Curated annotation (Swiss-Prot):
Binding site for substrate: 136-140, 169, 182, 276
Lineage: Bacteria, Pseudomonadati, Pseudomonadota, Gammaproteobacteria, Thiotrichales
EC number, as in UniProt: 2.3.1.234
SUPFAM superfamilies, sorted: Actin-like ATPase domain (SSF53067)
Record keyword Endoplasmic reticulum present: no
Family in the record: Belongs to the KAE1 / TsaD family.
Highest taxon of the lineage: Bacteria
Function: Required for the formation of a threonylcarbamoyl group on adenosine at position 37 (t(6)A37) in tRNAs that read codons beginning with adenine. Is involved in the transfer of the threonylcarbamoyl moiety of threonylcarbamoyl-AMP (TC-AMP) to the N6 group of A37, together with TsaE and TsaB. TsaD likely plays a direct catalytic role in this reaction.
UniProt cross-references to Pfam families, sorted A to Z: TsaD
GO molecular function, one term: N(6)-L-threonylcarbamoyladenine synthase activity
Cofactor: how and how many bound: Binds 1 Fe(2+) ion per subunit.
Annotated CDD domains: ASKHA_NBD_TsaD_bac
Protein name: tRNA N6-adenosine threonylcarbamoyltransferase
Keyword presence, Magnesium: no
Length: 336
């Protein structure tokens, strides 16, 4: 069973083909709009939608030409329907529905976060058994779930204000650095020369619940920098180091509590921030010390991509899900 996946929720245009029977990704194409939006310091929704319109058909032609496949080989077309930028989602959904109608292929709406949650399965060495705890951590979401079976997601905790990745994005904007923020913070943190210069708070780390809060951490960074007399590149690096350490300390602590609370021994990490090297290192240590199993997506599939949508769509399709009509129903916000 072969699925074409389409991702267009924000600023990445992704198409991929996944073979469910072989558990194998056949092809994957991605066009990133980062350079386009970088000069604006963030994603411009109208520009994002226009870029998806310009690139989707080109990527589709390329992916079929390179694989030698045709639409006759495709059993289902999966597309991101929620959450995301409504205009961008509409472009991808309309493209998917149109292809489905023309070629008489079933279509299926996929939740963007479900795609991220399942993305570690794109590593052919991953054999993840249920149940497990999952941390979704990105610029838009920071959430902990217990996953008992495919499609059974129990929310354990989430950020009550900003996502972890948003704290990184806002910090880079404050410091006059580039976009996206997570990469810039990590790169500059590696250049820190005085790792104890700044001590930042760990909001809600010691609270018994599994919720997060990163707004206060973001504000602490802002106040610290405004009070700093020497706003040099060296101190930018030191502050990024302190921010990264504080955020990851909280994330790791909450993951440990979630595993203890649910009595699980398997942890899945996904979302854009899952590419962070320090986060991976600290969670690997946690897993080693407490004999947990931990699963990350391949680095190239941490951020938005079509491969995770094709994979999630395949799992949904074999579980009996598919669109019942041509209605396009996309949502800017939607819980998993």
């Amino acid at each position: 069973m072969i699925v074409l996946g389409i991702e267009s929720s924000c600023d990445e245009t992704g198409l991929a083909i996944y073979d469910y029977s072989k558990k194998k990704l056949i092809a994957d194409e991605l066009y990133s709009q980062v350079k386009l939006h970088k000069k604006y310091g963030g994603v411009v929704p109208e520009l994002a939608s226009r870029e998806h319109i310009a690139k989707l058909n080109l990527l589709a032609k390329k992916i079929f030409k390179e694989t030698g496949l045709s639409f006759e080989d495709i059993d289902c077309i999966a597309y991101t329907a929620m959450p995301g930028l409504v205009g961008a989602l509409m472009v991808g959904a309309t493209f998917a529905k149109t292809l489905g109608l023309i070629h008489n292929i079933d279509t299926i709406a996929v939740h963007h976060l479900e795609g991220h949650l399942l993305s570690p399965l794109l590593d052919h060495n991953s054999n993840i058994e249920y149940p497990f705890v999952a941390l979704l951590v990105s610029g838009g979401h920071t959430q902990l779930f217990e996953v008992k079976e495919f499609g059974e997601y129990s929310l354990l905790g989430e950020s009550i204000d900003d996502a972890a990745g948003e704290a990184f994005d806002k910090t880079t904007k404050l410091l006059g650095m580039g976009y996206p923020g997570g990469v810039e913070v990590a790169n500059l943190a590696d250049q820190a020369t005085d790792k104890s210069k700044y001590i930042l708070p760990r909001p809600m780390k010691n609270k018994p619940n599994l919720d997060f809060s990163f707004s206060g951490l973001k504000t602490a960074v802002l106040n610290t920098w405004y009070d700093e007399q020497d706003q040099s590149l060296e101190n930018k690096a030191n502050l990024c180091y302190a921010l990264q350490n504080a955020a990851i300390d909280v994330l790791v602590s909450k993951c440990a509590k979630a595993l203890q609370k649910t009595k699980n021994t398997r942890l899945v990490i996904s979302g854009g921030v899952s590419a962070n090297k320090l986060l991976r290192h600290q969670l690997d240590l946690l897993a080693k010390n407490r004999e947990y199993q931990i699963f990350f997506p391949p680095m190239k599939y941490c951020t938005d991509n079509g491969a995770m949508i094709a994979l999630a769509g395949a799992y949904r399709y074999v579980n009996g899900f598919k669109d019942s009509n041509l209605e396009i129903n996309v949502k800017a916000r939607s819980p998993l």
